[in-house]
């Protein structure tokens, strides 16, 4: 009997592992974003929930925030820093919202381009249905020292990062 129970659990686990997940199809055609082959118009908001008198992001109010976003007609959230919490990503997906995930150039090694750790995030979450596309950069004009003051160095970094992302994840656009 124990062997049969163990076999049943193993069979169930294998079945779950091989059940395909439903991921929305995202593509750019000309100047249009298509989601599941239908035009997708971004009605978005930048979201970085830092409570008053705090300096770090806190998702304690995520349920309320998502409800307010939906009531306002928002369908897309742009985040400045990747969310490394599957439960939060699942809540965003369950709310029917999509994410534009931004990667900074130098974020002290936390999912940034300089350290290359942004690729770890993409590997981990590229199949999550909340992801609409990846975004490289935010306000780089404030940090020319990152590129020795030469804009061509920035263009080269963007080109390399885009190529690496497309190798890992051909299913999401890069902005």
At which residue positions do the language-model features occur?
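Positively charged n-region of N-terminal signal peptides that target proteins for export
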Residues: 1-5
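Bacterial Sec-dependent signal peptides at the C-terminal "C-region" and cleavage site
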Residues: 11-25
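Active-site mouth of glycoside hydrolases
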Residues: 28, 32-175
């Amino acid at each position: 009997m124990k062997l049969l129970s163990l076999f049943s659990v193993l069979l169930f686990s294998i079945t779950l592992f091989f059940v395909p997940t439903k991921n929305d199809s995202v593509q750019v055609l000309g100047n249009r974003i298509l989601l599941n082959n239908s035009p997708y118009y971004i009605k978005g908001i930048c979201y970085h929930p830092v409570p008053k008198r705090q300096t770090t992001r806190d998702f304690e109010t995520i349920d309320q925030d998502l409800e307010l976003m939906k009531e306002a007609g928002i369908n897309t959230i742009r985040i400045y820093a990747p969310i490394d919490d599957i439960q939060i990503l699942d809540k965003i997906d369950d709310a029917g919202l999509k994410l534009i995930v931004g990667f900074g150039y130098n974020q002290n090694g936390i999912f940034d381009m300089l350290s290359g750790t942004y690729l770890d995030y993409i590997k981990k979450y590229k199949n999550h249905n909340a992801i609409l596309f990846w975004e490289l950069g935010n306000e780089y004009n404030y940090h020319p020292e990152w590129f020795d003051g030469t804009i061509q160095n920035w263009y080269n970094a963007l080109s390399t990062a885009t190529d690496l992302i497309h190798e890992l994840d051909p299913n999401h656009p890069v902005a």
